[in-house]
């Protein structure tokens, strides 16, 4: 299935049903009073994370989603039926952005997480709502409000613990094939990897972590060269980056310069991503003798000003891979996910009609002074005979 990590959709919540103007009419009850019911609320639009999905390709073809309209109110104080909600399923890791305001509505970071993205219109009020001591036969009602409409930008960001970083042909896909059941394509030409892939590294029955492999970066990626930097966003939620360096590049390029290219493109893309924990991993040591591999790695680390531990591995024959994976596992256990990676929603998503009803009632209802002598209740005595209104 084609991997699509961005999509734009239109969501429209259902309109609210209109209120009803109606009066009770029965035999022997000529002036039965108002009995117009309220309309039904419009249906809402929800997004839900589904771990069984891994692409947004469906939303390249189906771009519009509309919830059901609420029914109009009816006589006999019958309230209209509420419109049905709709549920849009997206992969876990999807970020939802309102295109109109640029506001991030939320990140869908765990299975079955559900979030409202468009609120249905409020129901209109029937004329029964406007009955008062000075208006016994109200003929006003309110119309249902339109459902909220939003253009949403969906961005899928892979949820992984470890991110692979490096130039094309550095051995990132070979590493993932060696440590997990993932089978990304591996070949001896650049840009074999065209889309991100995930692999689960299971250390034992109770310990595992997820590795993300993205297409390799080249110089000028921040300006769109190669595959650009559009896939770097998939590393934003990783806890550690494995910067993979080819010790014996097939094009005989300088590994130090290659490493600096990656660091430069990373810094241009995001300062936050640049500051993430990053480990140096020297790959393809099997192409050199042991002493030469160690001396090259040491020289590269010194040229980069690297003072921390680095790793020498051969992803092709798994030399040094197991020790690296156990160190990664220990790091992940010692460094739980950042607070922002846990489902963090805005304190409150503002919707259009939150205060609508209160305002409508305040505007439509006249202020009346309280008078204990005035019979302001509609009772059976009022219904059985001719109504007489006394004025002072």
Swiss-Prot record:
Could you tell me where the Polar residues compositional bias lies? Answer: 129-143
Pfam families per the UniProt record, alphabetical: GTP1_OBG (PF01018), MMR_HSR1 (PF01926)
Q: Which domain of life is it from?
A: Bacteria
Q: What region holds the Obg domain?
A: 1-159
Indicate what this protein is called per its UniProt record: GTPase Obg
Q: What is its EC number?
A: 3.6.5.-
Q: Name one GO molecular function term.
A: GTP binding
Domain called OBG-type G: residue spans: 160-333
Compartments in which it is found: Cytoplasm
UniProt main location, coarse: cytoplasm
A GO cellular-component term linked to this record? cytoplasm
Amino-acid positions noted as binding GTP in the UniProt annotation, renumbered to this chain: 166-173, 191-195, 213-216, 283-286, 314-316
Keyword annotations from UniProtKB, A to Z: Cytoplasm, GTP-binding, Hydrolase, Magnesium, Metal-binding, Nucleotide-binding
Residues annotated as region Disordered? Answer: 127-146, 360-392
Residues noted as binding Mg(2+) in the record, renumbered to the chain: 173, 193
Family per UniProt?
A: Belongs to the TRAFAC class OBG-HflX-like GTPase superfamily. OBG GTPase family.
């Amino acid at each position: 299935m084609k991997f699509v990590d961005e999509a734009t959709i239109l969501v429209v919540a259902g309109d609210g049903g209109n209120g009803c103007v109606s009066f009770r009419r029965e035999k022997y009850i000529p002036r039965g009073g108002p009995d117009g019911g309220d309309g039904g609320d419009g249906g809402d639009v929800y997004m839900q994370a589904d771990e069984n999905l891994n692409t947004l390709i469906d939303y390249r073809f189906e771009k519009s989603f509309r919830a059901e309209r609420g029914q109009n109110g009816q006589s006999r104080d019958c309230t209209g039926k509420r419109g049905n909600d709709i549920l849009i399923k997206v992969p876990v890791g999807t970020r939802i952005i309102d295109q109109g305001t640029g506001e991030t509505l939320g990140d869908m970071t765990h299975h079955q997480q559900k979030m409202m993205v468009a609120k249905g219109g409020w129901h209109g009020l029937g004329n029964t709502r406007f009955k008062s001591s000075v208006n016994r036969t109200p003929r006003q009602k309110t119309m249902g409000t339109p459902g909220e409409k939003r253009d949403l930008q969906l961005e899928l960001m892979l949820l992984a613990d470890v991110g692979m970083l490096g130039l094309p042909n550095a051995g990132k896909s070979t590493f993932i094939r060696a440590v997990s059941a993932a089978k990304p394509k591996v070949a001896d030409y650049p840009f074999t990897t065209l889309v991100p892939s995930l692999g689960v590294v299971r250390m034992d029955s109770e310990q595992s972590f997820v590795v993300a492999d993205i297409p390799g970066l080249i110089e000028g990626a921040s300006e769109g060269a190669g595959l650009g930097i559009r896939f770097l966003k998939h590393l934003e939620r990783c806890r550690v980056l494995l910067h993979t360096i080819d010790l014996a590049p097939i094009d005989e390029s300088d590994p130090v310069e290659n490493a600096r290219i990656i660091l430069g493109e990373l810094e241009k893309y995001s300062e936050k991503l640049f500051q993430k924990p990053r480990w140096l991993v020297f790959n393809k040591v099997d192409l050199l003798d042991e002493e030469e591999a160690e001396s090259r790695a040491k020289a590269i680390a010194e040229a980069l000003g690297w003072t921390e531990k680095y790793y020498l591995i051969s992803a092709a024959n798994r030399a040094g891979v197991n020790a690296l994976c156990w160190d990664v596992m220990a790091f992940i256990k010692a460094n739980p996910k950042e607070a922002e990676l846990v489902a963090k929603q805005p304190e409150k998503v503002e919707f259009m009609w939150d205060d609508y009803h209160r305002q409508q009632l305040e505007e439509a209802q006249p202020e009346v002074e309280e008078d204990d002598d005035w019979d302001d209740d509609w009772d059976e005595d009022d219904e059985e005979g001719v109504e007489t209104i006394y004025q002072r």
